[in-house]
Amino acid sequence: MKVIFTQDVKGKGKKGEVKDVPVGYANNFLLKNKYAVEATPGNLKQLEQQNKRAEADRQQEIDDAKALKEQLKDIEVEVSAKTGEGGKLFGSISTKQIAEALKKQHDIKIDKRKMDLPHGIHALGYTNVPVKLDKEVEGTIRVHTVEQ
């Protein structure tokens, strides 16, 4: 019997997958517990429409990320910090401070966890901070660290 899985079932199939399973297993377990629905032409068409919708949503996310990447190319974020002798910072500039400055100065909200800056910024001047905007789209933020 052909079924469309509505949930992941360990060892059998993932959500949205169409598979042939034994009739008893389908009737007594999958259909009864609503882990799957029978693969009728109507259900198959509905699955196809869901997949198209999901693909369109995913493409929209990628397009939005690419637009944000282009916007970030022309932006410079200025962050001020206390310094000691020789332009050395007290502490470091974290991704949290960069995200807050970006929101305040340019009204762009980016999650601090998407920024790739493992040790922070420890010196004055310009630093390019890589940002993972999407699985496929990566951009950079130009950060200018100035003395407070």
UniProtKB/Swiss-Prot annotation:
GO BP annotations, alphabetical order: translation
Cellular-component GO terms for this entry: ribonucleoprotein complex; ribosome
Organism: Staphylococcus epidermidis (strain ATCC 35984 / DSM 28319 / BCRC 17069 / CCUG 31568 / BM 3577 / RP62A)
Claim: Isomerase is one of the keywords in the record: no
Tree of life domain: Bacteria
Keywords: Ribonucleoprotein, Ribosomal protein, RNA-binding, rRNA-binding
PROSITE patterns: RIBOSOMAL_L9
TM region positions: none
Family designation: Belongs to the bacterial ribosomal protein bL9 family.
Pfam families: Ribosomal_L9_C, Ribosomal_L9_N
Protein's recorded name: Large ribosomal subunit protein bL9
Gene3D superfamilies in UniProt: Ribosomal protein L9, C-terminal domain, Ribosomal protein L9, N-terminal domain
A GO term, aspect molecular function: structural constituent of ribosome
Purpose of the protein: Binds to the 23S rRNA.
